[in-house]
C-alpha cells in the first residue's frame, strides 16, 4: 500500500498534489526529534523537496562532489573508477562484476537526489551510508540519513561559516569574481539550515539568500507543521 494518497486536487499545470498519510509525518517527527532537529523543518523539507513522494529521484549530471571509498569487509564493493583510480582499482572490478554492477553505476547513483528529503547519494555516502543507494527511497532510511546530514550541518556550521558576497554589476552569477566575498561565524537558525540544505552552504548576496525563493517556500511550508 502506498504511503501517499492523492487528494484529488490539481495544482498549477496539471501537477498532482499528494497528501502524506499520518504515518509519514509521525515518522519524520520521530526521527527529527531523535537527531535534535525541529520536526517542522524536516517536514517542510519533505514537502518542498519531494512533495512527500518516497520514490522521488532526480539525476544531477553536473554534481561533482562524489565520495570515494574502497572495498572492505564491512561495506559494499563500490569504487569510483575515475582515470586516476583505474589502475589501483583493478583488484575491485571482479567484485563489481560478481554483483552485476559497475563503478559507473555508483557514480550515477551518487549524483542522484533520493526520496523524501532528496538527499544526494554522495552526501549519504559521506555521512557513512554503505547500503545500496536505492535504499534511500525507503522513508525510514531516507529520513534517518537526511536528518543525520542536517544535524551534521548544524553542528559544523561554523567550520565553513556564512558566505557574504558583496554587490557587483549584473545579476548574481554573471560577474566573476564577486566584488567581495567574506566568511563569518554565525549562529545558524532554521532558515539558514534550509538555505544550506538546498545550496550546500549559506550564501548571502546583498543581504539576501542566493536561493531566497527556495527559503521562502520552506518557511511557508513550516507553518503547516507547527
Spans of model-derived segments:
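Catalytic glycan-binding domains that act on GlcNAc-containing polysaccharides
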Residues: 3-226
